[in-house]
Regions:
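Substrate-binding pocket helix/loop in short-chain dehydrogenase/reductase
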Residues: 108-114, 118-123
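Residue(s) in the substrate-gating loop at a strand-loop-helix junction
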Residues: 157
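C-terminal helical subdomain
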Residues: 190, 197-198, 213-255
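Canonical Rossmann dinucleotide-binding motif of NAD(H)/NADP(H)-dependent dehydrogenases/reductases
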Residues: 9-42
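Active-site helix of classical SDR
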Residues: 137, 173
Length: 267
């Protein structure tokens, strides 16, 4: 049987990928997987030491071009542009963006009722999670549109589809990421650029430390499990699109956003 262009799996070898939030958690796990798959990886993070540590780690795993580390703040337009340009300068193309950078709340702030949340915390969360997504997505678009190919994967959350108590600002930011992603996906179809959102449930990453003494839910997802889904998504044939992928632990807590269909009371 003959193979048709666009219907075969997308080979990640020789592709250039920019991963924000690449210094830890899901972003670092994505960097490891993409390096093993043969992609050229730009590890972008706010923390230069973490970005360099992941770059050094994946350099030993890489089967493709040597990875690079980029340091900057996704909230700043100049840094977002520098992330994109730095990837292009190093690899002469930009095929993949995995935008994983994000915050939950102020460090060690702990969950609070909305009237207790400061403007400082609101600005931090919205500017990082939503405005940062806008700025970095916008920065990579010209290169992808010129190539008539590319794939953007934005990290939203299950908190981007159902509101949760004590997480009002975080939920608002992740709802926004989902809306931005869906709108951009419609805009980019004509240019051959895919735009997808991944919505993981609670993940065992340093982000959870921002909840202070409150323990992470049991079970929580391993970051590599989320990274594996992202790698699978990026390897899909060009004529196939997966949208708004919700990732849950198999032995998950009972979902509160779905009502039973058999007439029985919800728990």
């Amino acid at each position: 049987m003959s193979e048709h262009v666009g219907t075969t799996p997308n080979d990640l070898r020789h592709k250039a990928a920019l991963v924000t939030g690449g210094g830890s958690g899901i972003g670092a796990a994505v960097c490891r997987r993409l390096a093993r798959a043969g992609a050229a990886v730009a590890v972008a993070d706010f923390n230069g030491e973490r970005a360099q540590a992941v770059r050094d780690e994946i350099a030993a795993l890489a089967t493709g071009p040597a990875p690079i580390a980029l340091v900057g703040d996704v909230r700043l337009e100049a840094d977002a542009e520098r992330f994109a340009q730095g990837t292009l300068d190093a690899f002469a193309r930009l095929d993949v963006l995995v935008h994983s950078a994000g915050v939950l709340r102020l460090p060690q702030g702990g969950p609070r009722l909305m009237h207790q949340i400061t403007k400082e915390e609101c600005d931090l969360v919205i500017d990082t999670n939503l405005k940062g997504t806008f700025l970095v997505n916008r920065a990579v678009l010209p290169a992808m549109m010129k190539q008539k190919a590319g794939h953007i994967v934005n990290l939203s959350s299950t908190s981007g589809r159902i509101g949760r108590a004590f997480d009002s600002v975080y939920c608002a930011s992740k709802f926004g990421v989902l809306g931005l992603t869906e709108s951009l996906a419609e805009e980019m179809k004509q240019f051959g650029v895919k735009v997808s959102a991944v919505l993981p449930d609670a993940v065992a990453t340093p982000l959870w430390d921002q909840n202070g003494p409150i323990p992470a839910p049991d079970p929580s997802l391993d970051p590599d499990r989320v990274a594996g889904v992202i790698e699978y998504l990026l390897a899909m044939p060009r004529d196939v699109s997966l949208e708004n992928i919700v990732i849950l632990p198999f032995k998950t807590r009972r979902r509160k956003d779905r009502k039973p269909t058999d007439g029985s009371p919800s728990g």
